[in-house]
C-alpha cells in the first residue's frame, strides 16, 4: 500500500512545537514574533491566502500585521511602506502577497525587503546564498517538501530526482536545495523533450508544472515517490460544484508508487507552516534565542 505524505498532520505537529517555542522564548524577547503581510488589490485568492496566514500566525502565537493596499497605490508608496517595515523592530518577517497587479515592478519591490526579513526567500541576496549553499531564508514550499520527505525518512542523498517546473517560487529553489542535499537533480519544463521518459527514471518525482492532471502512471516508475505541488479548481460532474486537483492524476498513480502527497492536504499546509518557521528563525536570530528548531531547516 502506498504511503500518504500527510502535510496537514505534519504541519499541525510542527505548529505545536512552534507554539511551545514562542511561549517559552517570548519571556526572554519581551515580545512575540511579528509577521507583516502586504497585499495589493482585490484578488480573491490572495484574500483567502492572507486570511489563512493570519489564522496560522494566531495558532502559534505570532503577531500578524496585514497591510491591504488599494490597486491604485503607487509603486513608490509600496516601496516606502516596505522600507518603514524594514526598520520596525516589532517586525521579524515580511512578505508581498503574490500575485500583485501587473503595473507594479514585482522584483523591485521584493528587492526592497531586508533579506533577514524576507520570509518568502525571494530576495536576490537570499537566492544567491541558496546557490552558494550558505545559511539564509529559504523558499517556503521547497522547504516544506523537504520536511515532508524527512518526516518519513525518505532518502534524498544519491537519489535520482526529477523536478517538473522552473518557477522562482518552487522549481528553481527546490532543485538547488535538493542538489545541496546531494540529490541527483534533473529540472524539466514545458520545452523538455521526452518528458515522460525523463520522469520514469526518477526515484522522486516532483510535479510543479501548473497543469492539472498532467502526470499519470505512464510517467512514474514502480516504487517512486511522487510530490504534487499543483492545486487547481475544476468543474465537477455536478455543474454547480467544483473540485480540487493537482498536477498528478492521483487515482491512476497511487497503485504504482511508494509514497505520494494528496491534494489538498499535502504540500499546501507545509508551505504556510514554513512561513511561520522562517518568521520565528528571524526572531530567534534577533534575540539570540535557543536553536531547538534547527532540524526544520532544509
From Swiss-Prot:
This is Bifunctional protein FolD. GO terms for biological process: L-histidine biosynthetic process; methionine biosynthetic process; purine nucleotide biosynthetic process; tetrahydrofolate interconversion. Catalyzes the oxidation of 5,10-methylenetetrahydrofolate to 5,10-methenyltetrahydrofolate and then the hydrolysis of 5,10-methenyltetrahydrofolate to 10-formyltetrahydrofolate. HAMAP family: THF_DHG_CYH. Pathway: One-carbon metabolism; tetrahydrofolate interconversion. Homodimer. GO terms for cellular component: cytosol. It comes from Prochlorococcus marinus (strain MIT 9312). Its EC number is 1.5.1.5, 3.5.4.9.
Amino acid at each position: 500500500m502506498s504511503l500518504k505524505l500527510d502535510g496537514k498532520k505534519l504541519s499541525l505537529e510542527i505548529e505545536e512545537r512552534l507554539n511551545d517555542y514562542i511561549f517559552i522564548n517570548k519571556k526572554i524577547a519581551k515580545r512575540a514574533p511579528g509577521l507583516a503581510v502586504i497585499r495589493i488589490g482585490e484578488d480573491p485568492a490572495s484574500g483567502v491566502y492572507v486570511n489563512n496566514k493570519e489564522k496560522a500566525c494566531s495558532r502559534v502565537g505570532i503577531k500578524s500585521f496585514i497591510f491591504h493596499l488599494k490597486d491604485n497605490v503607487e509603486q513608490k508608496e509600496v516601496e516606502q511602506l516596505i522600507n518603514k517595515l524594514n526598520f520596525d523592530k516589532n517586525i521579524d518577517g515580511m512578505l508581498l502577497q503574490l500575485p500583485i497587479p501587473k503595473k507594479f515592478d514585482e522584483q523591485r519591490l521584493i528587492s526592497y525587503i531586508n533579506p533577514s526579513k524576507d520570509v518568502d526567500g525571494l530576495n536576490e541576496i537570499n537566492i544567491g546564498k541558496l546557490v552558494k549553499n550558505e545559511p539564509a531564508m529559504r523558499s517556503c514550499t521547497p522547504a516544506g517538501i523537504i520536511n515532508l520527505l524527512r518526516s518519513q525518512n525518505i532518502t534524498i542523498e544519491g537519489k535520482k530526482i526529477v523536478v517538473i517546473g522552473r518557477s522562482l517560487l518552487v522549481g528553481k529553489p527546490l532543485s538547488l536545495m535538493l542538489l545541496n542535499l546531494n540529490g541527483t537533480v534533473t529540472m524539466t519544463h514545458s520545452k523538455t523533450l521526452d518528458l515522460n521518459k525523463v520522469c520514469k527514471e526518477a526515484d522522486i518525482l516532483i510535479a510543479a508544472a501548473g497543469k492539472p492532471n498532467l502526470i499519470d502512471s505512464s510517467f512514474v516508475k514502480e516504487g517512486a515517490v511522487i510530490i504534487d505541488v499543483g492545486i487547481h479548481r475544476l468543474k465537477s460532474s455536478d455543474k454547480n460544484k467544483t473540485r480540487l486537483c493537482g498536477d498528478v492524476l492521483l487515482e491512476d498513480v497511487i497503485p504504482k508508487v511508494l509514497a505520494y502527497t494528496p491534494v489538498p492536504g499535502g504540500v499546501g499546509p507545509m508551505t504556510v507552516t514554513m512561513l511561520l518557521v522562517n518568521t520565528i528563525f528571524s526572531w530567534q536570530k534577533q534575540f539570540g534565542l535557543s536553536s531547538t528548531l534547527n532540524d526544520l531547516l532544509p
